[in-house]
């Protein structure tokens, strides 16, 4: 069996629950009522200073340096709490690799580019993209490519290093260095690790954020007869070892994030996502490139989407904090507003539409023709179904892009967010392509 087919088949056989499977605030039966170190930390914090916002709760639970979920655990894959698209099929990463090469060509073939991934998981997606770069070596031979990974988890950065470099990459000894790990991939491309996007060197860059924005902390608000009230996390007075949601008695500063014409009864807002989008927009407007964001979410229509995942099952977000992943749907309308017209935005489009436009059917046929065994073909089709089926990932995940205005409209002036949605130039994945 062809080596590429074997890699694809191996991933297609994984059992999967995707984090966008359903929308829940986390009221399902909990897997565990244990008093975790994180729960003790949070209860002490709340008893000392008062109830905390949902955003602060998520930040502590996921990224606390001592007890955070993402800091020390490998939560991906069959033994983790969820599986992502790159873990299901290599076709996914290959098509994204083609997208980045397509944008590099369309923007004028810069002599150098940085591939920057935010939250790279196990490094699987970057590895698949790099394999495409190697296969297109004749096209990219004059381009100096470097990889820059933004990762807060030391555990995951070590796994990424093994995936990309096939060896352990030592930590940088210079305490003042913005890079905390540096190495070379199997194909000879330099790779560096950072803890913050702002630490990545500026220059022509292609940015990738796959299932990254959904784990950023959100503020939750509920409309009441007295106006908007923010949702907080407090200690349950009926059970000293449990937490509960409460409403703030009065307005809070974060209420400023709510749109004046908001009509929903419940709203989730992610200021951190806005800051990152503004940083990406400024960089792309100044030095060129593009950003591709793939996540599950909505275009300003959904309400209460915060939920937890533990062992591939839905998990109450307030039970055993620090042991389960917390996630909330991405509001793409908010991301579009935060770009502030500095760059053009495309999408969101459903994953099945994007992948079909990128030629997933053509690529699947090639792999099926090379897979001689019936079981291998069945697994390839299973992976395809998981990515494309509307009831699975096909309609739940969406793609969204940021591009320079001149890439779409032939001008350099800033435009407002509405204008950026109607490009005059075709962009792979977001426009239907004719395959010969």
From Swiss-Prot:
Comp. bias intervals (Polar residues): 413-427
Molecular function, one GO term: enzyme binding
Organelle targeting peptide span: 1-41
UniProt entry keywords in alphabetical sequence: Methyltransferase, Mitochondrion, Transferase, Transit peptide
Catalysis performed (reactions): L-arginyl-[protein] + 2 S-adenosyl-L-methionine = N(omega),N(omega)'-dimethyl-L-arginyl-[protein] + 2 S-adenosyl-L-homocysteine + 2 H(+)
EC number: 2.1.1.320
Disulfide bonds: none
Record region (Disordered): 411-436
Superkingdom as given in the UniProt entry: Eukaryota
Annotated compartments: Mitochondrion
Residues in coiled coil: none
Similarity annotation: Belongs to the NDUFAF7 family.
Entry function: Arginine methyltransferase involved in the assembly or stability of mitochondrial NADH:ubiquinone oxidoreductase complex (complex I). Acts by mediating symmetric dimethylation of 'Arg-118' of NDUFS2 after it assembles into the complex I, stabilizing the early intermediate complex.
Assembly mode: Interacts with NDUFS2.
Protein name as it appears in the record: Protein arginine methyltransferase NDUFAF7, mitochondrial
